[in-house]
């Protein structure tokens, strides 16, 4: 007697099993505990970069935490240098020890990653130093290894095509560099002042 082919009752479980295996492969965890499919997506990328600094044993089971930021700004991350046309002209830089300042030449510490965290709000991340730019409640700029609310800046396009970066946590405080390339306190400047004007450029 000829053998009968697989019945519908046996095919369905096999198909479902194949789908489950395929989905599991797509969600395979990366070495630092984050999921490949979630790295770099808005808040997920920020959280992933912060959690990557923790020892593996200290990382939570699911490091890539989903948030309500949404994925509508996906793929808009920019590698830029922020140029402030004061004094001899300075690029914002994030030093390896977390200090923020200005440097005239293009350096590895002046290469920044601007990432959207919500509409009109970005984080500024030092590619070489691995520190986020943050602003304290007193208007002081400093670098931190972990993403917090103090790392959020409203990116405001000015009439001269430069940008101003206002602290999201402390409205009315702006990122600024002096004519000597030092940071100025955000509560002592305004967007009408040239020291707060930054041009994102490659």
UniProtKB/Swiss-Prot annotation:
Query: Where is it predominantly found?
Result: secreted
**What domain of life does the UniProt record list for this protein's source?**
Eukaryota
Q: Which Pfam families match?
A: FGF
Tissue distribution: Expressed in the blastocyst inner cell mass and later in distinct embryonic tissues.
Look up the record and give one Gene Ontology term from the biological process aspect. cartilage condensation
Entry GO MF terms = growth factor activity
Gene Ontology cellular-component terms for this entry are: extracellular region
Question: Would the keyword Secreted turn up in this protein's UniProt record?
Answer: yes
Keywords, A to Z?
Developmental protein, Differentiation, Growth factor, Mitogen, Proto-oncogene, Secreted, Signal
- Per the UniProt entry, the signal peptide is 1-29
The family database entries (InterPro entries) matched by this protein are listed as: Fibroblast_GF_fam, IL1/FGF
Location comes to: Secreted
Q: Which family does it belong to?
A: Belongs to the heparin-binding growth factors family.
| Protein task | Plays an important role in the regulation of embryonic development, cell proliferation, and cell differentiation. Is essential for survival of the postimplantation mouse embryo. Required for normal limb and cardiac valve development during embryogenesis. May play a role in embryonic molar tooth bud development via inducing the expression of MSX1, MSX2 and MSX1-mediated expression of SDC1 in dental mesenchyme cells.
Subunit info? Interacts with FGFR1, FGFR2, FGFR3 and FGFR4. Affinity between fibroblast growth factors (FGFs) and their receptors is increased by heparan sulfate glycosaminoglycans that function as coreceptors.
Recorded protein name is Fibroblast growth factor 4
Q: Which organism is it from?
A: Mus musculus
């Amino acid at each position: 007697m000829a053998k009968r082919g697989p019945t519908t009752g046996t095919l369905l479980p096999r198909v479902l099993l194949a789908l489950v295996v395929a989905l599991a492969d797509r969600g395979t965890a990366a070495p630092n505990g984050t999921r490949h499919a979630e790295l770099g997506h808005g808040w997920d990328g920020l959280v992933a970069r912060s959690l990557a600094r923790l020892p593996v044993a200290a990382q939570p089971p699911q490091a890539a935490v989903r948030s309500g930021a949404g994925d509508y700004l996906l793929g808009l991350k920019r590698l830029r240098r922020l140029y402030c046309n004061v004094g001899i002209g300075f690029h914002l830089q994030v030093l390896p020890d977390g200090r923020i300042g200005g440097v005239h030449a293009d350096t590895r510490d002046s290469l920044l990653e601007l990432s959207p965290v919500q509409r009109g709000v970005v984080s500024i991340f030092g590619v070489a130093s691995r520190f986020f730019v943050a602003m304290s409640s007193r208007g002081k700029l400093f670098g931190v290894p972990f993403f917090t609310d103090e790392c959020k800046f409203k990116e405001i396009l000015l009439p001269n095509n430069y940008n101003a970066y206002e602290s999201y946590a402390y409205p009315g405080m702006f990122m600024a560099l002096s004519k000597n390339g030092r940071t100025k306190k955000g509560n002592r400047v305004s967007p009408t002042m040239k020291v707060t004007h930054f041009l994102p450029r490659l």
